């Protein structure tokens, strides 16, 4: 078959004479094999391109996580330093070349005390911790205030001329062991104070008149559990509602806001999100009738039906809510165990193993969040005193513990923190920081070089 054209395609491989194009019959088998070859080549190139994109992405993700680990290490370092500074009033931690000045001592005391009234400036009706429990918030270990107060009374009688915590732990009162509160009990009962991120695990919102966990969307349910189980709540000065299981000597009203001020506090009974009972009982905050009215008004604003809700107002009996009267008759608490997740305190309500609220452990382990500001959920860094002093002494010439003032190069650039700064921290902090960003799930010696520097 010939097709005649008015154009001249002399240079065309299909031309057949001047001005003519000859289209010969096509061999379909040859075309098919040629197409298969092209398709295979396309598949190979696509696969190679995908692998390259994955490598670039994984490399970027690893670099970002390594950079994040430096941020985590810096925050862990300052948490360890903060604890050491708070603990300095109890045990001489730093090897100062000269005695601590009065100004330095007052700065440390004001730092501790400032945590007690946090939030008072936001709302006029906010309530701070009862005076008896200030000592709990100031104590770096947050030992149960009721127990500490017994030793505080003995310290007042002794007139030893020593600061209370120094007298209690290393001074004249170190051998004092009260029958009503033995040393073992004082050491064991330490109140857990939540950080900003930990606090989110206990936050609840009101949706269509029912109390719902903010993160999981599950209804609050306190009806199941062993007899005597108590669920407590606080409402912050920002009108955020927090609730969880009370654990004597471990988790109390002061735990939610780390000793900060509240608008309301008490105890609740909730059946699948439906409020049944409100009790304005809190030994830590000792709420008034006004605070209870404020909380009831908050519930009404959020369409909670209070017609069938049993309300117990604050009274003198609230002082015994935290088991002050019957603390001597109760059984000794179980030894403290390390908690794997911040949500665990809310799920250990049932001796039969029936948790009332779903755990977020698996979700937390499988998700990686790069938001590190505002605290790390208080992951306490176990840094030996020797390692801390070694780093402090190495930085004395710069007279600063700020990382940006220690290194020859800047702490961060326009694209973020410098990965090389990780080598400036103790090994324990580096390992914990890598675990936090899911780069090192378990401690492995292979992650560290023989010199103790990070192999990255």
From Swiss-Prot:
- This chain belongs to the protein called IQ domain-containing protein IQM3
Q: Which PROSITE patterns match?
A: IQ
What gene codes for this chain? Answer: IQM3
Question: Which Gene Ontology cellular component annotation is one that this UniProt entry carries?
Answer: nucleus
What tissues harbor this protein? Expressed in roots, rosette and cauline leaves, flowers and siliques, and at lower levels in stems.
**Induction (free text):** By cadmium and lead. Down-regulated by salt stress.
Question: Which InterPro entries does the record cross-reference, listed alphabetically?
Answer: IQM
Q: Which UniProt keywords apply?
A: Cytoplasm, Nucleus
This protein's superkingdom? Eukaryota
Q: Carries keyword Nucleus?
A: yes
Q: What is the protein's species of origin? A: Arabidopsis thaliana (Mouse-ear cress)
Upper lineage ranks?
Eukaryota, Viridiplantae, Streptophyta, Embryophyta, Tracheophyta
């Amino acid at each position: 078959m010939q097709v005649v054209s008015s154009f001249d395609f002399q240079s065309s491989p299909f031309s057949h004479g001047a001005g003519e194009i000859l289209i010969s019959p096509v061999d379909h088998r040859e075309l098919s094999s040629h197409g298969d070859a092209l398709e295979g080549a396309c598949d190979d190139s696509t696969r190679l391109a995908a692998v390259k994109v994955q490598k670039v992405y994984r490399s970027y993700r690893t670099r970002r996580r390594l950079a994040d680990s430096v941020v985590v290490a810096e925050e862990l370092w300052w948490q360890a330093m903060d604890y050491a500074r708070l603990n300095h009033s109890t045990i001489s931690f730093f090897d100062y070349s000269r005695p601590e000045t009065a100004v330095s001592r007052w700065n440390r005391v004001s730092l501790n005390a400032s945590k007690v009234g946090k939030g008072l400036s936001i709302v006029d009706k906010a309530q701070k911790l009862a005076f008896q429990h200030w000592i709990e918030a100031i104590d770096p270990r947050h030992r149960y205030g009721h127990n500490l107060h017994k030793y505080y009374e003995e310290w007042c009688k002794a007139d030893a001329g020593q600061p209370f915590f120094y007298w209690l732990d290393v001074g004249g009162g170190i051998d004092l062991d009260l029958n009503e509160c033995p040393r073992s009990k004082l050491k064991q009962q330490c109140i857990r104070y939540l950080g900003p991120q930990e606090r989110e695990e206990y936050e609840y919102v009101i949706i269509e008149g029912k109390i719902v966990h903010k993160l999981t969307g599950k209804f609050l349910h306190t009806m199941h559990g062993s007899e005597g189980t108590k669920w407590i709540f606080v409402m912050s000065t920002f009108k955020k509602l927090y609730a969880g299981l009370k654990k004597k000597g471990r988790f109390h009203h002061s735990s939610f806001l780390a000793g900060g001020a509240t608008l309301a506090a008490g105890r609740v009974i909730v059946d699948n999100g439906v409020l049944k009972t409100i009790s304005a009982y809190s030994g830590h905050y000792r709420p008034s009738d006004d605070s209870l009215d404020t909380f009831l008004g908050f519930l009404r604003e959020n369409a909670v039906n209070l017609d069938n809700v049993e309300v117990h107002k604050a009274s003198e009996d609230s002082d015994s809510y935290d088991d002050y009267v019957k603390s001597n008759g109760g059984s000794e608490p179980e030894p403290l165990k390390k908690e794997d997740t911040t949500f665990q305190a809310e799920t250990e309500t049932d001796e039969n193993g029936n948790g009332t609220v779903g755990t977020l452990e698996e979700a937390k382990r499988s998700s990686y969040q790069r938001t590190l500001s505002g605290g790390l959920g208080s992951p306490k860094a176990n840094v030996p005193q020797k390692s801390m002093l070694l780093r402090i002494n190495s930085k004395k010439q710069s007279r600063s513990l700020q990382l940006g003032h220690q290194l020859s190069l800047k702490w961060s650039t326009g694209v973020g923190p410098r990965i090389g700064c990780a080598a400036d921290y103790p090994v324990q902090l580096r390992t914990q920081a890598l675990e936090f960003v899911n780069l090192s799930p378990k401690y492995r010696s292979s992650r560290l070089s023989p010199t103790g520097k990070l192999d990255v």
